[in-house]
From Swiss-Prot:
Record flagged with keyword Nucleus: no
Subunit structure, interactors included: Homooctamer.
The keyword Ubl conjugation is assigned to this record: no
SS bond partners: none
GS catalytic domain residues: 106-356
Compartments, record wording: Cytoplasm
GO biological process, one term: glutamine biosynthetic process
Organism whose genome encodes this protein: Vigna aconitifolia
InterPro entries: Gln_synt_N, Gln_synt_N_sf, Gln_synth/guanido_kin_cat_dom, Gln_synth_cat_dom, Gln_synth_gly_rich_site, Gln_synth_N_conserv_site, Glutamine_Synthetase
UniProt family annotation: Belongs to the glutamine synthetase family.
Protein name as catalogued: Glutamine synthetase nodule isozyme
Length: 356
């Protein structure tokens, strides 16, 4: 095993200019991540300098067998924490051979919204709190739970420490460092209310980069759980009953919200979000109705409510923002399995471009 480990950790730059690029794209479910690697002649830092590639879309549920080729366009580059050296991870989006975005390519439309002059001028910042659950392989039951049974009730686990409270910290910490190495603006981690559930935060990130960074952070987490022999779940309510669900709270601000007088702009933006509540809920993740029940720090899915420091609201404004008269707000509705390209661009569209 030590030889295998040595080979995995070989530093290619000692002997060759060539690098390995791992191309990542979103599969047919809209949540599954796929990837494959290719050799390039030397280091690359600009995605536009990378070659397009293709894959068999009939094997990912994205194209018919008789016309199976899907083309992937490189969009963002990150350092590869697994191969290290000059090797890279490449976030791509997917198109037909004719150049049309395929249905699961939500990045294409998001990029249009983020490149609109009115949106560019507002410089939208995002901070996404990605919750997830670690499951025991083969039994699909949370890490640290007795198989077929339950741990003690919620209370001691949130931000807890100790072998009876925190399960999977090695995975969480490995992911944290790997994201920092990759160049992702990961801003923190914490244990969540339900045992076996954790959270990491990405941001502040501007515009389309929030989606790119969150997707690659998810990919890195998938790879680390693969190594650890643990299953990663983004199910918004993995366990029925008196257990917290998993969300992807999205913190948001624009330039005018961050400037003096921004609190009035925030209130106006929240009012617009309330008017499009149903459209946002429809786009905020599968199975969210199991999570947004009005219990376990959520608002009811059919009700739009905002408040200061209220974790039972759809939109929460922090005490610091209220006091300063400017800042940001948190959209607490997105589920853990949401597509960040959809959520971030929709918030920008509703608050900046949409005229009620």
């Amino acid at each position: 095993m030590s030889l295998l480990s040595d080979l995995i950790n070989l530093n290619l730059s000692d002997t060759t200019e060539k690098i390995i690029a791992e191309y990542i794209w979103i599969g047919g479910s809209g949540l599954d991540l796929r990837s494959k690697a290719r050799t390039l002649p030397g280091p690359v830092s600009d995605p536009s300098k990378l070659p397009k590639w293709n894959y068999d879309g009939s094997s990912t549920g994205q194209a018919p067998g008789e016309d199976s080729e899907v083309i992937i366009y490189p969009q963002a580059i990150f350092k590869d924490p697994f191969r290290r050296g000059n090797n890279i991870l490449v976030m791509c989006d997917a198109y037909t051979p004719a150049g049309e975005p395929i249905p699961t390519n939500k990045r294409h439309n998001a990029a249009k919204i983020f490149s609109h002059p009115d949106v560019v001028a507002e410089e939208p910042w995002y901070g996404i709190e990605q919750e997830y659950t670690l499951l025991q392989k083969d039994v699909n039951w949370p890490l640290g739970w007795p198989v077929g049974g339950f741990p003690g009730p919620q209370g001691p686990y949130y931000c807890g420490a100790g072998a009876d409270k925190a399960f999977g910290r090695d995975i969480v910490d490995a992911h944290y460092k790997a994201c920092l190495y990759a160049g992702i603006n990961i801003s923190g981690i914490n244990g969540e209310v339900m045992p076996g559930q954790w959270e990491f935060q990405v941001g502040p990130a501007v515009g389309i980069s929030a989606g790119d960074e969150l997707w690659v952070a998810r990919y890195i987490l998938e790879r680390i759980t693969e190594i650890a022999g643990v299953v990663l779940s983004f199910d918004p309510k993995p366990i029925k009953g008196d257990w917290n669900g998993a969300g992807a709270h999205t913190n948001y601000s624009t330039k005018t919200m961050r400037n003096d007088g921004g609190y009035e702009v925030i209130k106006s933006a929240i009012e617009k979000l309330g008017k499009r509540h149903k459209e946002h809920i429809a786009a905020y993740g599968e199975g969210n109705e199991r999570r947004l029940t009005g219990r376990h720090e959520t608002a009811d899915i059919n009700t739009f409510l905002w408040g200061v420091a209220n974790r039972g609201a759809s939109i929460r404004v922090g005490r610091d923002t209220e006091k300063a008269g400017k800042g940001y707000f948190e959209d607490r509705r997105p589920a853990s399995n949401m597509d960040p390209y959809v959520v971030t661009s929709m918030i920008a569209d509703t608050t900046i471009l949409w005229k009620p």
